[in-house]
């Protein structure tokens, strides 16, 4: 098999699609791909060491994102994090409603990444949820008046991206959160912050959001690693059942090397 390599005579500028692996991430990951490969969910000495390594990576990710370690759910990337936020976040809110109650509405920006937009549309069809897609203005910023209208009544979840993946518009998440608090204070705000790192101080920019998605390969980390921050006061119901990893929110054997690489890249990028 011939490896895909970047032509040395060309300049790679497509960093919004993916980034080269940072040397810091590669160096941190290599020992875990050869010697430190144990399953951190096990009970023997090697597993315990792997668990310490995983916990250290989670602690660093949490610190850099302005979260507590227990709020960081490790995922396979931004798409899974967004899917868990949309489906899991909405389901957690809906579960608090009476069985006979009408399901709470779902709100998102019409310019969301497909990982959010298609998740919202799929949820709307599967659960009979009213989906309200909010337009943006000529500059790509969310129309706050239209958002205020969309957030009236019983809304379960609102998803507005932090930075647009096509044109780079930075959304006013503080104003979005304020608008949401006036119209439907019981709703959860999710933001897809995949394109925000390393260009913004993500901890500050997303402080108003209850759910925050990131993806390692957008800031020099490995592909196949991401995270969803579930801040205190917000909840998600799992999309993947199994061994109960990630505090029951995302089952599956943890990708220790991926988490370590993501933590190293995030530290280098911020």
Predicted ranges, named:
Residues 1-270:
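Pyridoxal 5′-phosphate
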């Amino acid at each position: 098999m011939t490896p895909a390599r970047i032509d040395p005579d060309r300049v790679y500028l497509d960093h919004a699609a993916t980034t080269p692996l940072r040397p810091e991430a590669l160096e941190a990951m290599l020992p875990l791909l050869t010697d430190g490969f144990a399953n951190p969910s096990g009970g023997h000495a090697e597993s315990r060491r792997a668990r310490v390594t995983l916990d250290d990576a989670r602690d660093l990710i949490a610190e850099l994102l302005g979260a507590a370690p227990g709020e960081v759910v490790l995922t396979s990337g931004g798409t899974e994090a967004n899917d868990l936020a949309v489906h899991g976040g909405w389901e957690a809110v809906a579960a608090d409603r009476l069985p006979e109650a009408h399901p709470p509405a779902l709100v998102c920006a019409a310019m969301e990444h497909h990982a959010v937009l298609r998740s919202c549309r799929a949820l709307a069809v599967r659960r009979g949820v009213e989906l309200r897609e909010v337009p943006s203005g000529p500059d790509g910023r969310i129309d706050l008046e239209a958002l205020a209208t969309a957030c009236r009544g019983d809304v379960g979840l609102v998803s507005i991206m932090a930075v647009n993946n096509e044109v780079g518009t930075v959304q006013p998440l503080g104003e979005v959160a304020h608008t949401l608090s006036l119209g439907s204070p019981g709703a959860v705000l999710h933001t897809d912050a995949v394109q925000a790192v390393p260009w913004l101080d993500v901890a500050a920019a997303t402080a108003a959001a209850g759910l925050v998605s990131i993806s390692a390969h957008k800031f020099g980390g490995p592909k196949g690693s991401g995270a969803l921050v579930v801040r205190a006061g917000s909840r998600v119901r799992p999309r993947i059942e199994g061994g109960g990893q990630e505090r029951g929110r995302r089952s599956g054997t943890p990708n220790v090397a991926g988490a370590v690489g993501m933590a190293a890249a995030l530290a280098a990028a911020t």
